């Protein structure tokens, strides 16, 4: 799901794309603080940056990122008045799919390119967390990431191939509202489980074992039920067993759920039928079949 631009070659435009995430593979108290590993999927925010006055209806966080990038290279702040940011994205907003991270990360890379610079992933992550908690979709590899301050960035080996049937709920939750919840005590209580999940993520990537990745994600999803419970969760776990799926993952600060599978091996039509039969579609009326992809922002 990519947004396409019709700019002619030679136009003075910088275009960058960043993927969405189907929630997180894992999120919780790991190595002394709350951290996450995002689950990048093939649904993208595309951002074009040109030399022109700003659009009236620009996204405020993308404009804030332009200002951060200018400040990073010590350019005059008023240059922002001659930089236009055009965001094209159909990623669902406020549901745990990293729509905001995709927007601001792509904006940062496109703006940097427009100014004649490039951004390494560490600097990009630091710029993003200076605006809001950030998903690890900004990294090419699956990465354990401290999404609040970017202090921890531990990359994994390439993961095994995974598809996800993403269950989209009409329920929205802003990331900043999740972060206002009193949650540290519950996070710490699940720290042993999350350490196990993190170990399984690393093992899954080293051994190319999708079942291990599903096991890791399911452990984290179960732990998340004490913080932000998903409706029909027990029925979803039963469905994973019944259809012999790899596991499930959730948005720990949102409402989406991902059923982890192989579209060549698992019967998607049967799975969707089971969702309806178990009345789970009342909670997740929309489903999207996506694949997990490499993360990172790419210039077009």
From Swiss-Prot:
Pathway where this protein functions: Cofactor biosynthesis; adenosylcobalamin biosynthesis; Polyol metabolism; 1,2-propanediol degradation
One CC-aspect GO term: cytoplasm
Keyword terms: ATP-binding, Cobalamin biosynthesis, Cytoplasm, Kinase, Nucleotide-binding, Transferase
EC number from the UniProt entry: 2.7.1.177
Molecular function per GO: ATP binding; kinase activity
Subcellular location per the Swiss-Prot or TrEMBL entry: Cytoplasm
Disruption phenotype: Growth is impaired on 1,2-PD minimal medium supplemented with cobyric acid, but is restored on similar medium supplemented with vitamin B12, cobinamide. A double pduW-pduX deletion grows as well as wild-type on 1,2-PD.
Residue positions binding ATP: 92-102
Miscellaneous note of the record: Catalysis proceeds by a steady-state ordered bi-bi complex mechanism in which ATP is the first substrate to bind.
Name of this protein: L-threonine kinase
Record organism: Salmonella typhimurium (strain LT2 / SGSC1412 / ATCC 700720)
Lineage summary: Bacteria, Pseudomonadati, Pseudomonadota, Gammaproteobacteria, Enterobacterales
